[in-house]
Amino acid sequence: VTGEHGAERPGTWEYYDRRAVEGARTIGHALAYWKGLGVEATLSEIEAEAAEVRQLIRSMPPSPFVEVGAGPGTFTADLPGWGIALDQSEAALRVVRSGPDGTPVVRGDARRLPVRDRAVARVFAAHIYGLLTKEERRPFLSEARRIAEELVVVDAGRPPGVPAEHWQHRTLGGGETFSVFRRHFDAEALAAEIDGRPLFSGRFYVMVTA
């Protein structure tokens, strides 16, 4: 199976596969990320927004879903209903498999989802839409609309001074460096981009439904 967003950017997807081996990401990792971008932030501020987002996710009506870009299952257990967790990273999916909720996992490509038309009610995508280039976003959105009635996107907010999009250099524990494309969002702008409406507009997190 090809990488979730294709083999044309192996550095990005190899980074996330390798990172999954290092374990789940924490609020501490998020704080380090924002501080690395020059953002003044505290652990409690990020925790408060993350808690609001999780509560919003849990309050959604239960429904069949596909979680695209599930990673190591950061939000999988919060999703109401029943469905599958999909990611390009086998390492990440091993973490999801070992979790207590028992969500089935599928390794696959976000641009070619291995799901029949209108098979589920919801596609949930957390911190993946902001990794897609312009060329990758179009097929992802088309696939999400093909298989589901609703698309819910959770992604990174855009505090003052943070670029809307740029290439980042990420380093893992072993010292290896990767180039990763990243976008940061205003909730209203993201909603307009995917023909949706904002559910949460924070400094560090945004959540939109379409």
Regions found by a protein language model. Give the residues of each.
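Short amphipathic alpha-helix with an adjacent loop that forms part of the alpha/beta core around
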Residues: 113-117
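Short catalytic micro-motifs in class I SAM-dependent methyltransferases
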Residues: 127-131
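N-proximal accessory regions
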Residues: 119-121
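Class I (Rossmann-like) S-adenosyl-L-methionine-dependent methyltransferase catalytic domain
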Residues: 2-65, 71-112, 132, 136-139, ...
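A conserved beta-strand element that flanks and buttresses the S-adenosyl-L-methionine
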Residues: 124
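Short glycine-dipeptide loop
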Residues: 147-151
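Class I S-adenosylmethionine-dependent transferase superfamily signal
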Residues: 143-144
